[in-house]
Amino acid sequence: MKREYQDAGGSGGGGGGMGSSEDKMMVSAAAGEGEEVDELLAALGYKVRASDMADVAQKLEQLEMAMGMGGVGAGAAPDDSFATHLATDTVHYNPTDLSSWVESMLSELNAPPPPLPPAPQLNASTSSTVTGSGGYFDLPPSVDSSSSIYALRPIPSPAGATAPADLSADSVRDPKRMRTGGSSTSSSSSSSSSLGGGARSSVVEAAPPVAAAANATPALPVVVVDTQEAGIRLVHALLACAEAVQQENLSAAEALVKQIPLLAASQGGAMRKVAAYFGEALARRVFRFRPQPDSSLLDAAFADLLHAHFYESCPYLKFAHFTANQAILEAFAGCRRVHVVDFGIKQGMQWPALLQALALRPGGPPSFRLTGVGPPQPDETDALQQVGWKLAQFAHTIRVDFQYRGLVAATLADLEPFMLQPEGEEDPNEEPEVIAVNSVFEMHRLLAQPGALEKVLGTVRAVRPRIVTVVEQEANHNSGTFLDRFTESLHYYSTMFDSLEGGSSGGGPSEVSSGAAAAPAAAGTDQVMSEVYLGRQICNVVACEGAERTERHETLGQWRNRLGNAGFETVHLGSNAYKQASTLLALFAGGDGYKVEEKEGCLTLGWHTRPLIATSAWRLAGP
């Protein structure tokens, strides 16, 4: 057969039909060059040298495996959306050269994903940024309600992707033509992601020519999920769901909230965790399954446990205690009788350091009285008294005259000035008691009840303290629309979770000194429990409203206005507090990421460029 066409010249142009003149010309040219072409494949129109048969067979097997990596299988449900991402301008010339054709197919399947399209411009407002393990994602402050994001469909996981049963005419193409999602002129531009072009799945569809000739089975899609694209889709899905909630479009919100776990599963690290907590909070709000306040012994004990782990895992509470103690220590300079009122004593972890500093003071320690305020316990145990006993034992070991009183109050607004005065009558011959009031992450809870903050500040004024220390989250989660609050909290807690991830490798200063083999495991437990601690705050900010929403964080500027209107003025924190706080952070893993800044006499601690908590000190304004 080869000799019969020996005199024919030229080469095949691309036909695949048996018996065509172009096929004959191709086979003849190969024979004329002395190459042994497989006659069976040549009869079908494909030029394969006998010496290349093993290589071609191996490449075909690799191609079959690559096309099977999309998780498709028999009996799978159709998903026509995959075909819409294919381009129409990628042509593989000379498909009769089967070896080169298969090799080009493999290179296309293994090609890197196309560049991301620009995120949709949802409005003209300035966008913020959420950091994640995969990069930085822009957060538009609002989402257009007409956005096609409400039609968001999930990206199937490799184990759960489905094969289309009935492909449209668009899906069944000439097997010698392959489309990719990389061209701006392709049909995928008109059917990009439901995020308005913000993210796309990369889809490749192809079938080997021999298989296409022998079997008319439609080609199966291969899905390559890019985590950065999925991250952008995840952020926009969260924001679109929040806007649907704000507009009371519950059907759209319900559809979107079901997509968030699918998108979050493609992420890693902090982004996946924070998205899971926000997705849960949105689901609770959409389905009206609000978190109940701690009303059992187990819940109260668990909340205390989470607080203790958060203290150990990251420097935020340590920074709050250290800077507040430094301001109180300077205010108590030269005083012989001092009294501290702690609005949220918890386990009393703040005060051993202050007692120790007072014990080392030149001239000896003063007489120290501590009033600790805490909520009632569900089992009516006196947890406050147990904290007092531990502190009294510590004070005894360092020879500090110590007195303690615990005050049980459901809310700080229940306090009256007489409760904070010394028991019994003071000796007129003794030096008057100098009072300091301390509040760490407590003031913002008062904003849930109208007039409660003003009542508490009036009580504080009545006892005439020398100094009032206030530590609060540096965030605005208490004003604007629900979508504004949601966007701000998503930004804030994404940064907080990033800082936990960044500081998880080496733990806190206690691990450096102990050198225990169990330190890495303990650090991992602290981080997980700290994430749960923050997750509860997220749930309260997003899922709750009215008096139930107690996590009403405000910025330092807002607190400055509130305290100024109540008759207080700022006490500048000294340079010693700044220097020693910076030294403290150097002991933590990820210390390079933590930043201490001085802001109008106050100190803030943040992660990289984002402040997260702020310490301020106040005194009664002059007449």
Swiss-Prot record:
A motif (DELLA motif) lies at residues 38-42. The DELLA motif is required for its GA-induced degradation. This is DELLA protein RHT-1. Residues 111-120 have a biased composition (Pro residues). GO terms for cellular component: nucleus. Disulfide bonds: none annotated. It comes from the Eukaryota. Residues 435-540 are annotated as: PFYRE. It is found in: Nucleus. A motif (VHIID) lies at residues 338-342. The gene is RHT1. It comes from Triticum aestivum. Residues 307-372 are annotated as: VHIID.
